Amino acid sequence: MNDTEQRLEHLLHQFDVRLVETGALTPRMNACWHPLSRTIYARHGLDPVTRVCAVAHELGHAYHNHDCSTPDNEREADEWAANQLLDDGLVEEAAWECDSEPVAMAAELGVTMHLLRTWERLYRIGRTRHVSACGLSLS
């Protein structure tokens, strides 16, 4: 289990959320949050990066007490997930190692491009977790 997966396990326990892998979700749905049972259902067979990001996103719904999918709720869940999985220190290190190439950075960080772009947007408006002072631009 890598550091990101360990972080997710900790968050699942912290929020008293159960994770169930299932073959019942369609290919269009990687995971879903069921608030009544406090369960995240993740589609069986997801690649590790997609699984981590999908579960973190669904934990964002749990954190915000969402009970339905709206554009605002989806954005909030994405933002929460980005801030849980990334911080400026991690992104700065990946930028150095990957010559600021976004696809390589996402791979190095173990997140989807969507999550990295979400984090970048939050960084630009000052809404990210800070570990170090860095000036990043993920063009």
What spans do the regions from the language model cover?
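Active-site hotspot residues in diverse enzymes, especially metal/ion-binding acidic/histidine motifs
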Residues: 1-139
